[in-house]
């Protein structure tokens, strides 16, 4: 009986190997590129400059400049909103946008990675309510900084109020209120870093 049962068990297959997350990120697709789980609150992914309707998801394949990695994105809606709590790893002061090449990008369901032109390797994954970011700075980087931008949004999203404060050595807590397609959106966040925060500029 045991042998018969084993013979009738279906073999598990990894169907995610057939998924191409880049489909729909060009043209008028408005597809979000990044890391999320089904029905999750978090969609961690790259965010580009606002350049019109085709950038509604925060990302368009024709573009090669990033302004951050936001925690919330819409996908396939044609609605320009979200992009909240953008983080950007930089290697020099006043760096607020970074170029990248699609050859340096990799995406699979639940995971996104890119090596930026400044040499920083960015990796993203997510749970239903948490985004995980890993930044690997180049060995010769003179500075290792992370810009946390609360003003950045997607499409017609506009910040109406925000707050941010450091708690302990590694944690930043804050709020971001905005208006856009969602007329009164309120986001509350906690950002915990693996290294102590040694300096901050508000």
Regions found by a protein language model. Give the residues of each.
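Accessory carbohydrate-recognition regions in carbohydrate-active enzymes
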Residues: 9-202
């Amino acid at each position: 009986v045991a042998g018969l049962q084993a013979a009738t068990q279906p073999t598990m297959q990894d169907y995610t190997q057939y998924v191409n997350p880049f489909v729909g990120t060009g043209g008028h697709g408005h597809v979000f590129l990044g890391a999320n789980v089904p029905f999750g609150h978090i969609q961690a992914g790259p965010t580009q400059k606002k350049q019109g309707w085709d950038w509604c998801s925060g990302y368009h394949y024709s573009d090669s400049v990033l302004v951050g990695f936001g925690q919330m994105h819409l996908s396939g809606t044609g609605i320009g909103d979200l992009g909240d709590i953008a983080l950007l790893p930089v290697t020099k002061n006043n760096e607020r946008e970074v170029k990248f090449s699609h050859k340096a990008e990799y995406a699979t369901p639940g995971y996104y990675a890119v090596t930026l032109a400044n040499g920083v390797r960015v990796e993203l994954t997510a749970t239903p309510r948490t985004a995980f970011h890993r930044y690997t700075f180049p060995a010769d980087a003179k500075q290792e900084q992370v810009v946390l931008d609360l003003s950045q949004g997607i499409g017609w999203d506009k910040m109406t109020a925000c707050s941010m404060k450091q708690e302990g050595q590694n944690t930043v807590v804050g709020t971001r209120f905005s208006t856009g397609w969602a007329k009164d959106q309120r986001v509350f966040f906690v950002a915990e870093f693996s290294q102590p925060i040694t300096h901050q500029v508000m």
